Amino acid sequence: MNLIDGKALAAKMQAELKVKVDKLKEADNVPGLAVILVGEDPASQIYVRNKARQATAIGLNSSVVRLPETVSEQELLDLIEQYNQSEQWHGILVQLPLPEHISEEKVLLAIDPEKDVDGFHPMNMGRLWSGNPLMIPSTPAGIMEMFREYDVELSGKRAVVIGRSNIVGKPMAQLLMMADATVTIAHSKTENLRELTKEADVLVVAIGRDRMIKAEDVKEGAVVIDVGMNRDEDGKLHGDVDFDEVKDVASLITPVPGGVGPMTITMLMEQTVRAASRKMNENK
C-alpha cells in the first residue's frame, strides 16, 4: 500500500499557484475570489474560513460576504450580479447549502459561467460532458491531479464510481472517460455492488456511508479514492472506505482526513487563477 498524500500535493500546488499569482500581479492583474455565505451553518463557516485562508496565503484578493439567513433570494441574486459585472472578481463561490426559501438552481444559474469556480453552472456541466470543459467541479478535478501526480494509468482501465451527485459522481465519471477509462457509475440502488467493485482497477467512493467498503469489496492492487467524510459517535472522522482494512489490498489509497479534502480547496484556487489568466489574455 502506498498513501496518496493529498495534503502534501495541495501544499505543492499552492506554492506553484503563488508563483503564478505573483506573475499576474506584476501585470497588474490580481486574481479575485468572492465567497458568499448565507446563514450560520457551522460546517459552512469552517469551509468558508478555510477557503479564505488559502486564498490569502497564495496572494489572491479574497472577499467573504456573510449574509443573514433571512436575506431574500433577490438580494442574493443582486449581489451575485454585482460580482458578475466587476472585473475585480474572477471567481464567485456561493457556499451550499442555502436556506429553504432560496432556490439553489436560480443561484447557480445566476453566476457567470466564466466565474463559476465550483463548476456547478449547467453550462459548465454541459461543456464537461461535451468533452470541452471550462470550469470543473473541484473535488473530481483534484482527484485527477492526484492521478497525474502518482502516475496512475487510466487508459483502458476499469473504473467504478460509487455515487451519482452533480458535485462528485457524475463529473468524476466523465473525467475518467475523457482519460479513456471504462467507467461504471454505481449508487445506493445498485444491486450486487461487490461484483462491480471487485473488478475495478480504480475505485472512487463518494456515497456518504461510513466505512461501507471493506477489503473483500476491493480488487487486489486497485487504486482507491475515498471522498467520504463521516463522523462517528465520538466525533472522529472516517471515510466511505474502511481504511484499516482496505490499505492492505489497495496499491494506492487516500486517507480521511488528509486525502481528497485538501485538494478540493486547492482546485478552487487553481480555477480562480486560471480564470484571471484567461481574462488577461482576452484583454490583450
Swiss-Prot record:
Key word Amino-acid biosynthesis present in the record? yes
Query: What does the record list as GO biological process?
Result: L-histidine biosynthetic process; methionine biosynthetic process; purine nucleotide biosynthetic process; tetrahydrofolate interconversion
Q: Please state the pathway this protein functions in, per its UniProt record.
A: One-carbon metabolism; tetrahydrofolate interconversion
Do you know which SUPFAM superfamilies this protein is assigned to? Aminoacid dehydrogenase-like, N-terminal domain (SSF53223), NAD(P)-binding Rossmann-fold domains (SSF51735)
The record's annotation in PROSITE patterns points to:
THF_DHG_CYH_1, THF_DHG_CYH_2
According to the UniProt record, one GO cellular component term is: cytosol
UniProt protein name? Bifunctional protein FolD
Tell me what organism the protein belongs to: Lactococcus lactis subsp. lactis (strain IL1403) (Streptococcus lactis)
Q: What gene, per UniProt, encodes this protein?
A: folD
